[in-house]
A protein has these predicted regions:
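N-terminal targeting or regulatory segments adjacent to alpha/beta-hydrolase or S9 domains
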Residues: 1-93
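Acidic beta-to-alpha connecting loop that harbors the catalytic carboxylate
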Residues: 29-32, 291-293, 328-329
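Glycine-rich active-site/cofactor-binding loop and its immediate structural neighborhood
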Residues: 84-142
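Cap/lid segment of the alpha/beta-hydrolase catalytic domain
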Residues: 119, 125-207, 211, 257-261
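Flexible loop/turn segments at secondary-structure boundaries
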Residues: 132-134, 169-172, 229-231, 252-258, ...
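Primarily recognizes the serine-hydrolase "nucleophile elbow" in alpha/beta-hydrolase
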Residues: 203-269, 273
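The feature captures the conserved acid-bearing segment of alpha/beta-hydrolase catalytic domains
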Residues: 256-313
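C-terminal catalytic histidine-bearing segment of alpha/beta-hydrolase fold enzymes
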Residues: 306, 312-346
Length: 346
């Protein structure tokens, strides 16, 4: 019979089983990295500069398939639901625009149109990052935080700019509760991803601006920071109407971070950051990363760029692809190299 205050069954201290859990997690990590090494070898066989040069559209379709639904659908030009004039500020008129997809999905952004816009005025999409909004990246909240006036630096260079709202805003700051990873999980069950959905919506917006005469088909560019840099890169890889891309503070090795909404089925065997960026070749691409970025290691950025460069070389387009590691944190470059590169290639 058990004595008072004694457990009914055999018991021991937690420390006795700690080693076993640690050995399990260590083994799981080793297994994953060993498999990643094998997957990288498979990726190197799946796509090479020579294979891409011979059949770029095969790989573009493969990327769309990896990202998933609805990128298998024809691009839909959305209906314009609302266009509200806010102000004339210097050389631009500022509008808030809302579009409707599928008859019910509302998608909005800020549009900056040159006061003296012409048919050949370049058109640029400007993407915010995690926690952001089009208003923030466009300096409408007086400060633009780590975006360093990204949108307005393009309007100052004579471009019409559309800055869309991606499903990334900070709920504590802006309200409108949402759970991106939860929604992405639902998209995965529909053979898609939030990346695929938002790339699809962005492609539809491009179609709208082209049809309205606000975006010349041969002068469309994209710029983005952090998550926005991811969207700039993926949108340009999928949509060849984009002639120049500036991706800042994102280009990295996704496997190291494995954020849920960046982790696609079989991605390690098909498309990493370098291979996704390769689908932009021979179109213009500028990649930037801060040397003291607190999220991504600039040395890994340089390693991934070394994997990317041969694709541009194979197409005789070395001058179309640039990397800049700038002195800074997780922020937009304070210098103008990327912005100048983008406008010069439009």
């Amino acid at each position: 019979m058990a004595e008072a205050n004694q457990p009914k069954y055999y018991a021991e201290e937690i420390e006795k089983d700690t080693r076993y859990r640690q050995e399990y997690v260590d083994g799981a990590n080793r297994f994953l990295y060993e498999q990643y090494g094998k997957a990288t070898a498979q990726r190197d066989q799946f796509i090479t500069p020579e294979q891409y040069k011979a059949n770029p559209e095969y790989y573009r379709e493969a990327l769309k398939q990896m990202l998933g639904y609805p990128l298998n659908l024809p691009v839909e030009t959305p209906a314009l639901t609302e266009k509200t004039f806010l102000a004339q500020d210097g050389n631009v008129n500022i509008y808030r625009m809302q579009f409707t997809f599928f008859g019910y999905l509302k998608f909005y952004g800020m549009y900056f149109e040159q006061v003296n816009a012409k048919k050949d005025t370049p058109f640029v999409l400007s993407f915010h990052g995690g926690g952001g909004t089009p208003e923030m990246v466009s300096s409408l909240h007086k400060d633009s935080a780590n975006y360093v006036h990204q949108t307005r630096r393009m309007t100052e260079r004579g471009a019409n700019v559309f800055a869309p709202q991606l499903l990334l805003w900070n709920v504590e700051t802006y309200g409108n509760p949402h759970d991106r990873l939860h929604l992405d999980g639902k998209m995965r069950q529909l053979d898609g991803s939030m990346t695929a959905l938002e790339v699809y919506l962005l492609m539809g917006c491009i179609s709208y601006f082209i049809e309205e005469g606000a975006a010349p088909a041969d002068r469309i560019g994209v710029v983005g920071l952090s998550y926005g840099g991811m969207y700039a890169l993926h949108l340009a890889a999928v949509d060849t109407r984009i002639k120049a891309c500036y991706s800042c503070s994102w280009f990295n090795r996704a496997f190291e971070h494995s954020w849920g909404d960046w982790s696609y089925r079989n991605a390690a065997k098909l498309f990493g950051s370098a291979e996704t960026a390769a689908l932009i070749a021979p179109r213009a691409l500028f990649i930037a990363m801060g040397d003291n970025d607190n999220l991504f290691d600039s040395k890994v950025t340089e390693e991934e760029y070394a994997r990317l460069a041969p694709y541009y070389q194979a197409l005789g387009a070395e001058d179309q692809c640039k990397l800049r590691v700038f002195p800074g944190l997780h922020e937009q470059d304070h210098e103008d190299f990327g912005f100048d590169f983008l406008i010069e290639h439009l």
